[in-house]
Amino acid sequence: MARSLKKGPFVDDHLMTKIEKLNEADKKQVVKTWSRRSTIFPQFIGHTIAVYDGRKHVPVYISEDMVGHKLGEFAPTRTYKGHASDDKKTRR
C-alpha cells in the first residue's frame, strides 16, 4: 500500500542535513547511511550514497530517474546464486 499523500514523502533528518551541507559547500563525497526507508529527493541528484544492505555499504549514485523511490530499492539484501544443478546429467 502506498503512503498517504497528505503525509508526504519521508526522509530521515540526519540524511537530509548531510546532503544540504554538501550542497551548500558544492562538495561531492560518499554519504554513509543505514536509512533504507528514506525517499530520494531532487536535492540528492549527483551524490553517491552508501546504503547498508545488512553486510556492507553499497554505493548508489543518484540520478534523476531515481527521484521518488526508496534508497533500499537500489541495495539488494539477498544474494541469489541460482538453484542447485542436476547431478544426473554430469554422472553419465
UniProtKB/Swiss-Prot annotation:
Single annotated GO MF: rRNA binding
GO BP term (any one): ribosomal small subunit assembly
Keywords, alphabetical: Ribonucleoprotein, Ribosomal protein, RNA-binding, rRNA-binding
Ranges annotated as spanning the membrane: none
Keyword Zinc-finger: no
Any one of the GO CC terms: small ribosomal subunit
Pfam families tied to this protein: Ribosomal_S19 (PF00203)
Domain of life where this protein originates: Bacteria
Gene3D superfamilies: 30s Ribosomal Protein S19, Chain A
Alphabetized PANTHER family for the sequence: RIBOSOMAL PROTEIN S19P FAMILY MEMBER (PTHR11880), SMALL RIBOSOMAL SUBUNIT PROTEIN US19M (PTHR11880:SF8)
Record's function text: Protein S19 forms a complex with S13 that binds strongly to the 16S ribosomal RNA.
HAMAP family named among the record's database cross-references: Ribosomal_uS19
Entry's family note: Belongs to the universal ribosomal protein uS19 family.
Protein's recorded name: Small ribosomal subunit protein uS19
Species of the source: Bacillus licheniformis (strain ATCC 14580 / DSM 13 / JCM 2505 / CCUG 7422 / NBRC 12200 / NCIMB 9375 / NCTC 10341 / NRRL NRS-1264 / Gibson 46)
